């Protein structure tokens, strides 16, 4: 497994991620929902991966379960990115990582889904902090996201019996 430092999450990247997250944090509810709405705009079929959306007739923006889920995913992703350099690895608790891996495996999440999610995340951040956005910031968030996804994928396997 490649470590963070081998993959090159630099001090500069960390600073860009921390600075932008500090600005976005206060709007994490709104941004989390925007993030997921972007995912479903790009890939409407992704809705069927979520049991609480599968048979729902409620508009996405009004679904009572979507916003809390979206916020928790957005905040976990951003918090993980902020901690990446300091910890030298993804800092989601191992039990949570196993649960995330098992859930993503069980629901049939594929590589394409992670790519769509990455694009939606970067677009959400770009819109949230347009005055800070730069190619360097895009690369920093992209690298942090890729490392989180690698950690989740390493746990995407059938439950051990």
Curated annotation (Swiss-Prot):
<dbReference type="GO" id="GO:0009413">
    <property type="term" value="P:response to flooding"/>
</dbReference>
<feature type="binding site" description="distal binding residue">
    <location>
        <position position="69"/>
    </location>
    <ligand>
        <name>heme b</name>
    </ligand>
</feature>
<dbReference type="GO" id="GO:0005344">
    <property type="term" value="F:oxygen carrier activity"/>
</dbReference>
<dbReference type="InterPro" id="IPR009050">
    <property type="entry name" value="Globin-like_sf"/>
</dbReference>
<feature type="site" description="Homodimerization">
    <location>
        <position position="138"/>
    </location>
</feature>
<feature type="binding site">
    <location>
        <position position="51"/>
    </location>
    <ligand>
        <name>heme b</name>
    </ligand>
</feature>
<keyword id="KW-0479">Metal-binding</keyword>
<dbReference type="Pfam" id="PF00042">
    <property type="entry name" value="Globin"/>
</dbReference>
<feature type="binding site">
    <location>
        <position position="99"/>
    </location>
    <ligand>
        <name>heme b</name>
    </ligand>
</feature>
<dbReference type="GO" id="GO:0019825">
    <property type="term" value="F:oxygen binding"/>
</dbReference>
<feature type="short sequence motif" description="Homodimerization">
    <location>
        <begin position="111"/>
        <end position="123"/>
    </location>
</feature>
<keyword id="KW-0963">Cytoplasm</keyword>
<keyword id="KW-0539">Nucleus</keyword>
<keyword id="KW-0561">Oxygen transport</keyword>
<dbReference type="GO" id="GO:0016491">
    <property type="term" value="F:oxidoreductase activity"/>
</dbReference>
<keyword id="KW-0408">Iron</keyword>
<keyword id="KW-0349">Heme</keyword>
<dbReference type="GO" id="GO:0020037">
    <property type="term" value="F:heme binding"/>
</dbReference>
<feature type="domain" description="Globin">
    <location>
        <begin position="8"/>
        <end position="157"/>
    </location>
</feature>
<dbReference type="InterPro" id="IPR000971">
    <property type="entry name" value="Globin"/>
</dbReference>
<feature type="binding site" description="proximal binding residue">
    <location>
        <position position="104"/>
    </location>
    <ligand>
        <name>heme b</name>
    </ligand>
</feature>
<feature type="binding site">
    <location>
        <position position="103"/>
    </location>
    <ligand>
        <name>heme b</name>
    </ligand>
</feature>
<dbReference type="GO" id="GO:0009414">
    <property type="term" value="P:response to water deprivation"/>
</dbReference>
<dbReference type="InterPro" id="IPR012292">
    <property type="entry name" value="Globin/Proto"/>
</dbReference>
<keyword id="KW-0560">Oxidoreductase</keyword>
<feature type="binding site">
    <location>
        <position position="65"/>
    </location>
    <ligand>
        <name>heme b</name>
    </ligand>
</feature>
<dbReference type="GO" id="GO:0046872">
    <property type="term" value="F:metal ion binding"/>
</dbReference>
<comment type="subunit">
    <text>Homodimer.</text>
</comment>
<dbReference type="GO" id="GO:0005737">
    <property type="term" value="C:cytoplasm"/>
</dbReference>
<comment type="function">
    <text>Phytoglobin that reduces nitrite to nitric oxide (NO) under anoxic conditions (e.g. during flooding or in waterlogged soil) and upon root nodulation. Required for general plant development and during nodulation, especially for the onset of symbiosis. Monitors nitric oxide (NO) levels during early phase of the nitrogen-fixing symbiosis and buffers oxygen in functioning nodules. May not function as an oxygen storage or transport protein. Has an unusually high affinity for O(2) through a hexacoordinate heme iron because of a very low dissociation constant. Involved in water stress tolerance.</text>
</comment>
<comment type="similarity">
    <text>Belongs to the plant globin family.</text>
</comment>
<protein>
    <recommendedName>
        <fullName>Anaerobic nitrite reductase Hb2</fullName>
        <ecNumber>1.7.2.-</ecNumber>
    </recommendedName>
</protein>
<feature type="short sequence motif" description="Homodimerization">
    <location>
        <begin position="41"/>
        <end position="45"/>
    </location>
</feature>
<dbReference type="InterPro" id="IPR001032">
    <property type="entry name" value="Leghaemoglobin-like"/>
</dbReference>
<dbReference type="GO" id="GO:0005634">
    <property type="term" value="C:nucleus"/>
</dbReference>
<keyword id="KW-0813">Transport</keyword>
<dbReference type="InterPro" id="IPR019824">
    <property type="entry name" value="Leghaemoglobin_Fe_BS"/>
</dbReference>
